[in-house]
Amino acid sequence: MKSIKLFTLAILGIFALFVSSCSSDDDLNKEPPAEEYVTKAKDILNGDIVLSTKATMSGVDKTHLASGCPTKFNFTWKEDGSMTLSLVDFTVGTMPFAVTFKCNTKFMNLNSWEKPERPEAGWVKFQGKDGNVTTNGDDPNDCQTGSGASVDGYLNVLTNQIEFIINYNMMNVRTETFQQTIDKSRLNNFKAEFEQYEKDLAQWKKDHGQG
């Protein structure tokens, strides 16, 4: 009987330690990064930036090309330190409609299980929820209560690497910006780069009997 009690106490102790650890990690996760990192993030993510992105619907890649599609995002900052990520009139490949998305995001530290996945120095996380999803590119709102649309991303402020996923919570549509290094000079070549993507997409459709 005594051994059963000791075993029970041991299990309870382990559980309490686990809960305490999770709580502590959750608190850490909500803390903003060091001010130095936030300053760097503001310098990196500022204005229009072209990134390669895949658009998926129910898990099916609608951009079709392994290199993704050149996509122009906009990043602006508010006085409270939050960042608004915008994507205006986005449609690509075989997507049946254009999407405008705006979401207010906050930066935070990585939690304990994210750090082993990104052991290099400089990584921070940014998240946003209830983003505004619309087909109206003129809608200025950066939130839509209860929309369920979200942003989950990571930025390395030392290497300029970025990756993030936008979940529109609509028809299982997501845009996945896979890990890549930000190159701000792509903005100057955006039109030509997008035209090349459209040519490559047309060839892909032809090769796959869709053109």
Residue ranges and their predicted role:
Residues 3-6, 16-49, 168-211:
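Bacterial Sec-dependent N-terminal signal peptides
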Residues 63-150:
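Predominantly extracellular/secreted and cell-surface proteins with exposed
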Residues 26-30, 105, 110-112, 131, ...:
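Short linear motifs in intrinsically disordered/low-complexity regions
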Residues 124-170, 174-186:
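Polybasic, proline/glycine-rich intrinsically disordered low-complexity segments
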Residues 2, 7, 70-72:
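Sparse, context-dependent recognition of short Cys/His-centered cofactor- or disulfide-binding micro-motifs
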Residues 3, 20-24, 52, 58, ...:
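Generic serine detector
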Residues 41-45, 50-57, 61-74, 83-104, ...:
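A taxonomically broad motif for mature regions of secreted/extracellular
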Residues 9-13:
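Sec-dependent N-terminal signal peptides
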